[in-house]
């Protein structure tokens, strides 16, 4: 099933073309990576799909699944984490189901138990990245957009995140 379709999308900033005639289809359960040089427009495309940025021409469609608690989960550069709250409090604030078992499950899957109750301002870059990933997957979204999800992670954390991504893709 197609979840996102992008057709002939073009984005300009001033006279500079950032995205030109981009078309793609994202299907349920698929893992897709955008690869390109720095400044190629990968993050810009993600922001357009998320609705954070406008575009000049083309169109895109996001299919809403009624069974999904949330349509889109996202991890973009500098995830919006409240620094004076604990990681757990950040997750609790953003948990649509209000079911703490959802939080406990994602914390366990990402091996965050040791520090989840500490203030987020004390987290290392890797710990903040894992919290951002937990936020992205927390509400069982229909699809997830991750911008450089392995950034700042140690090898064990990379394995944990990769396993979570593959598991969620298999669950469809």
What are these regions (language model features)?
Residues 50:
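Helix-to-loop junction immediately C-terminal to a conserved catalytic motif
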Residues 35-37:
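The feature captures the beta-strand-to-loop junction immediately N-terminal to the Walker
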Residues 92, 100-116:
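Conserved ABC ATPase "signature" region
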Residues 144-148:
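Catalytic Walker B motif of ABC-type/P-loop ATPase nucleotide-binding domains
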Residues 159-171:
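Helical segment within the ABC ATPase nucleotide-binding domain
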């Amino acid at each position: 099933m197609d979840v996102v379709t992008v057709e002939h999308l073009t984005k300009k900033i001033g006279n500079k073309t950032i995205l030109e005639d981009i078309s793609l289809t994202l299907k349920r359960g698929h893992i897709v990576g955008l690869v390109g040089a720095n400044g190629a427009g990968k993050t810009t495309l993600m922001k357009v799909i998320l609705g954070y940025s406008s575009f000049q021409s083309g169109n895109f469609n996001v299919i809403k699944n009624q069974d999904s608690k949330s349509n889109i989960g996202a991890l973009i550069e500098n995830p919006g984490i409240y620094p004076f709250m604990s990681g757990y409090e950040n997750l609790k604030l953003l948990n649509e189901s209000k079911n703490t078992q959802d939080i406990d499950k994602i914390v366990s899957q990402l091996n965050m138990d040791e520090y989840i109750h500490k203030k987020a301002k004390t987290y290392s870059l890797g710990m903040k990245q894992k919290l951002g990933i937990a936020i992205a997957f927390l509400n069982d979204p229909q699809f997830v957009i991750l911008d450089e999800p392995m950034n700042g992670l140690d090898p064990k954390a990379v394995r944990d995140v990769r396993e979570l991504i593959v598991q969620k893709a298999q669950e469809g």
